């Protein structure tokens, strides 16, 4: 199970995708937990789907930080609530 990093200095943003292709990114505050932004992101996803129903829309809340020269990412899927981690 992936745990959210709460200690590192990080950048956090909302990523909107259509069919897997990123179409919009918005920076959000890095304070607090990523799950605190779920209600607003779910509302935004519903609004997008209502206006453009033919797209395969998804939203993730993402954060990234440097750890000993390695860039780490965490992605929270708004629909499933699943948290994933990646290292670059």
Label the predicted regions:
Residues 4, 16, 27-30, 61-63, ...:
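Intrinsic disorder/low-complexity segments, especially N-terminal tails and targeting/processing regions
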Residues 21-39:
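A short, exposed loop/beta-hairpin motif centered on an aromatic-Gly-Thr core
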Residues 46-88:
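Short, mixed-charge low-complexity intrinsically disordered segments
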Residues 8, 22, 34, 65-67:
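Compositionally biased, intrinsically disordered low-complexity regions
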Residues 1-11, 80-88:
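Short intrinsically disordered terminal tails
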Residues 6-26:
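Short aromatic-glycine-(Arg/Gly/Cys) micro-motifs in beta-strand/loop hairpins
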């Amino acid at each position: 199970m992936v745990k959210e990093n709460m200690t590192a200095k990080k950048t956090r943003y909302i990523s909107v995708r259509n069919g897997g292709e990123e179409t919009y990114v918005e920076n959000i505050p890095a304070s607090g937990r990523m799950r605190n932004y779920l209600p607003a992101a779910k509302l935004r996803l519903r609004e997008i789907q209502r206006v453009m129903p033919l797209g395969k829309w998804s939203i993730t809340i993402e954060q990234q930080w440097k750890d000993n020269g390695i860039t780490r990412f965490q992605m929270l899927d708004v629909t499933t609530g699943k948290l994933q981690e990646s290292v670059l």
